[in-house]
Regions:
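Glycine/threonine-rich beta-strand-loop-alpha-helix active-site module
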Residues: 1-71
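Glycine-rich phosphate/pyrophosphate-binding beta-alpha loops
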Residues: 34, 145-174
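Carboxylate- and glycine-rich phosphate/diphosphate-binding segment that chelates Mg2+/Mn2+
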Residues: 42-153
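Re-entrant/interfacial helical elements at transmembrane boundaries that shape
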Residues: 44, 159-164, 180, 198
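A general structural signal for well-ordered alpha-helical segments in protein cores
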Residues: 86, 113, 158, 177-178, ...
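Glycine-rich flexible loops
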Residues: 90-93, 101, 114, 140, ...
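Gly/Pro-rich interdomain helix-loop hinge
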Residues: 168-214
Length: 214
């Protein structure tokens, strides 16, 4: 609403999505480590009049400038950090599995997963709910890389089913993703247990030093 031309209502954004124009420069500085919005043309808005969260997609949503500032994360409550980093992880996983993935997007998915999982492991091993803060820049980079990946390849069933939980029941988006993630992966395994899912299992298993994870 701040940068859109001649628009003062959320509904107008959706009515004019195909022809949305910017009136001002859009500069994005992430304040969580989940959305990757600084590198995508997607914004998720809670349309309270409809009781749903809906994506707004337009070239006008691309940032003109963006900066990753680790200090912006340091005052985050732990639950906000946790759920937003889960969102980034799911972006990386779903984009990796996407039929629209390519070799380049897979590189960003894999790097995002490596950063998220290695930093989670270190934070758990070294104690306390604030231990993640020393990895603030790595979590921002992971969110950025996952944003690049899903901006190209898209997301899938986990996100699709998580949106109603947020829009109707007001469950934080990352938590909604977490609630859906394992069951969706298990269903994928039932439907097609070979191919990219095997590669993902090997990737996650190596990062976590465990047997296949689903």
């Amino acid at each position: 609403l701040t940068v859109a031309k001649s628009t003062d209502r959320v509904d107008d954004l959706y009515d004019r999505m195909a022809n949305l124009e910017k009136e001002h420069e859009l500069i994005i500085v992430p304040t969580t480590c989940g959305t990757g919005s600084e590198v995508t043309n997607i914004s998720i808005i809670n349309r309270t009049t409809k009781g749903v969260k809906v994506g707004l997609v337009s070239p006008a949503m691309f940032a003109d400038e963006a900066a990753l500032v680790p200090g912006m994360l340091l005052s985050l409550p732990y639950p906000v950090f946790a759920t937003s980093s889960i969102d980034a992880m799911v972006h990386a996983v779903e984009s990796y599995l996407s039929p629209n993935a390519c070799a380049l997007s897979e590189l960003f998915s894999e790097k995002a997963l490596h950063l998220i999982l290695s930093c989670w492991k270190d934070a758990v091993a070294n104690g306390g709910k604030d231990a993640w803060k020393k990895h603030a820049l790595e979590f921002l980079r992971a969110s950025n890389y996952a944003g690049i990946a899903f901006g190209h390849a898209g997301c899938a069933a986990v996100h699709a089913m998580a949106y109603p939980l947020g829009g109707v029941h007001h469950i934080p988006h990352g938590q909604a993703n977490q609630l859906m993630f394992a069951d969706v992966m298990r269903k994928y395994q039932e439907k097609k247990p070979i191919g990219k899912l095997n590669q993902l299992e090997e990737l996650l298993g190596a990062e976590l030093d465990v047997e296949p994870v689903f």
